[in-house]
Amino acid sequence: RVRYENAGNLTVLVVPASDTKPETNVLYQDQAYDMILIAGEFSKFQNELSCMREHLSDNGKLYVADANRLGLKYFAGCQEEYRGGYFAGLENYDKDPERFTEDDRHGEARVYTRKEYEQILKEAGFSGIYSYYPYPDHKFPSCIYSDEYLPGRGELSDNRRNFDRDRLQLFDEKKVFDTVLAEGLFGELANSFLIEAGNRTGEQRVIYSKYSNERARQFAIRTDICKKADGEKSVRKYA
């Protein structure tokens, strides 16, 4: 809300995952939304997905930003996104008391693979599902890729990010990412997803975005590569 407080054409409503009361949760009110964003802890909103779909406007979209259960960083030694523990998500949360440390901050929140996210959304009635890949992850991204604009060799070098927990460094993620890209597996092993679900229009859409979030706000620049329905591409820059 603070970030967009000067935007006259935008109203931001925040719904915590714990709010399931119809009298306070805006998702139960008789209103249509142009965009609904689930930023983390997607698993806690699964029972609300059908309700969200019903409350989207005709061209409205749902966006899901969350981690990938098969993200390369978890193979390399990062702990699980919400519950903690090494390799917990990779082993599909098969608890081992000697290695798995339950994290009460997020309760039973969990993350999914790309196919699992897409299947959950389809079962809730969503169509037009399209996956983007925030890098290094969905919490502190510097760029967002898509299947139509994938990273180049040597491009994924900013991998030492695991601020909330200790981590191991089992291999050089940059080198392994190069192999992943060469084998066409980036969509399965990206660290995080930004998933769009909803009715697609015939207008152009962004297939790649990069922004200099390491700079002071007045010097930051965002670069988007857009693609029209006829395949024509264009570049846009924002200061």
What residue spans do the PLM features occupy?
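Short alpha-helix
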Residues: 105-133
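C-terminal alpha-helical "lid/dimerization" subdomain adjacent to the S-adenosyl-L-methionine
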Residues: 80-110
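A short glycine-rich, Lys/Arg-flanked "PGG" loop and its adjoining helix->strand segment in the class I
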Residues: 45-63
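Residues lining the SAM
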Residues: 39-42
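Class I SAM-dependent methyltransferase SAM/SAH-binding core
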Residues: 1-25
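Conserved class I S-adenosyl-L-methionine
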Residues: 63-89
